[in-house]
Amino acid sequence: MRSFPQLSLLRLFLLLGLLGTSWAGVGGSISGTIKDPSGAAIAQSAVSLVNTGTGARQSATTDGRGTYTFPVLPIADYVLEVNHPGFKPYRRTGIALDANSALRVDAVLQVGERTDAITVSDNAAHVETSSSQMGEVIAGSMMTGVPLNGRSYTDLLALQSGVAPATSITSSTVQDVGASAFSPSGDLNAGNISINGQREFANSFMVNGSDVEEDVNMGTAIIPNLDSIAEFRILTNNFDAEYGEYSGGQINVITKSGSNAFHGDVFEFLRNTNLDARNYFSPSRGSFDQNQFGGTLGGPATRNKIFFYSDYQGTRQTQGVDTGLIPVPSIQDRSGNLADLASSLVTTVSGPAWATALSQNLGYQISVGEPYYFPGCTNTNYSATSTTACVLPTLQIPNSAWSAPAQHLLQYIPAPNQPGNVFSTSAYNQTLNDNKGAARLDASTPWGLISTYYFLDNFTQNNPYPTAQGGANVPGFNAVNLGRAQLLNLGSTKTPSATAVNEFRFSYLRDSNDLGRPQGGVGVNLASQGFQVGPNTPGIVPLSPQTEGLENVVFNNYSIGTDTNELRQSNNTFQWLDNFSKVVGTHTIKAGGEFHYDQVNTHAIAQFNGSFLFFGSQTGSDFVDFLLGAPTQYNQSQLQPFYGRNKYLGLYAQDSWRL
């Protein structure tokens, strides 16, 4: 999308990757106690954890109470190995570590020779946890095993108890000046939910520990390819101190990483119209075709050292949008014959200026207070004692009396195609073209565990009826939504000693959207539509000449013209975070801080070329008001920019004491 300024994140990603700045990903911790058969603690035991996917090994030594702790670990399956002179080697397999989990794995060593060994298999099941945090883990295999419309993890957030969907925000709807609920990937759920009664903007959304919130309505701006997600977790209560910025839930998505084995998949999901039913009120069945395709690939770049993982998903969607049943003017009405609208003409002429204008247009004297119509009325001069005079005695408005804009714009109001002067169609399609992909690089180096992650999502959505942006609900005035989301996170996890770990992370999120860019009806200047135009005139001054088009006109049941509320918004979030963990006896002390700088750049182009509203306030009929040129209201506003800047600094310290 050329309309958005962009940073060449890919080049920055490659450069920093070569420099070795990285991050190992958000994971959990494993601790436990080593004892002999009598229950006595065994000090100075050599404890090792081996990542079964990458072969990475970490080591620790038990203290005087026989305890060990690995305070910071990436999510993975692990093997625990314990050795001590005079005891048989102990080996425990299938230890599955999830995001933000704290597992307790104890071991009892048996007296014997080192040539003997004890192996215990956990079959990848969770073992006893030593964390007070409350939340649910949803594994990647669970997500890909259920049919999800749109293939988004946010559709599974309600599986957690205490979660309720929000109803105050509608995707792609302008909520206020400079505020809109954007849909990630064009039409996915941004995850605005209420957790344990908190407001929907009180939640934290993270991908690999990096902040990925859209900075206005606080939903997620990033939804990774479902096949690339290892798991996600919702923390709902008793968060650790490092999550103190938000009072709602903590939603953390962890993406897959490469391993010593090559693994990947290719997929294609097809949905079409074949089994769809026709809307009862529509003359035909709307089309629907959706293809979601892509794949993943991960493996070793250098065995036991450097690992990669990449993914791509494309979505192509064509969907016929049903207008529903829209009451429109009859063929008779469109000729100026108002016989079937007679019962609506129940008001009287208001104001001397309007009475003068009607007199000039109709060619006979009209007075203030004169009824527009009643059965048996005539066009005789009206007076306070008159009982027969009315404005439209023949219920016919000659073309010469129509307003100039009405003569030009009538052709854009659809004629009825259903009984009862109703228009309905599902022949016009909404289309979506979305491409998103990511690449992750992990490495075990002398500088620590290293990882880089880059995500890019581009989408274009064409909407035939952009009513959410003040556009028409009849054909001919489509608008497009354009979006791009990018995430780069870098970090390093270093182990300066057997009892200390330091994590550093930097991330950059850019989320850009152009919502409601007019397409249909653009390029028709206002002067050619019969309007007076230009400065120093009683007419319209176009404030956005590049989108000048057919004037927006709103009636009681339908509207025509280009949409009135285009919103261009780009958000930037820069985040720096550092955590330091130290094991001291039975205490695990963790301290750190986070700083992020948020930018919100918004251009709300609301009613840039004006909007006329006809609600029948003059004659009693919106269509008759339109023909005569008597709008209820006219709105126009200037460009409304908003540039928000926010700096956040948070520090914390926490001591987890194991009794």
Task: Kindly label every feature range from the protein language model.
Residues 233-234, 265-269, 311-313, 453-455, ...:
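Transmembrane beta-strands of outer-membrane beta-barrel proteins
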Residues 81, 108, 196, 235, ...:
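Transmembrane beta-barrel domains of outer membrane proteins
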Residues 63, 87-257, 263, 270-282, ...:
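Periplasmic N-terminal accessory/gating domains of Gram-negative outer-membrane beta-barrel systems
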Residues 2-4, 10-139, 211, 225-227, ...:
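Periplasm-facing N-terminal accessory domains of Gram-negative outer-membrane beta-barrel systems
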Residues 116, 153, 191, 203, ...:
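Outer-envelope beta-barrel architecture signal
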Residues 54-55, 82-92, 391, 401-404, ...:
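A short, solvent-exposed loop/turn motif at the edges and junctions
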Residues 315, 327-398, 585:
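Glycine-rich (often Gly-Gly/Gly-Pro-rich) flexible segments and glycine-rich loop motifs
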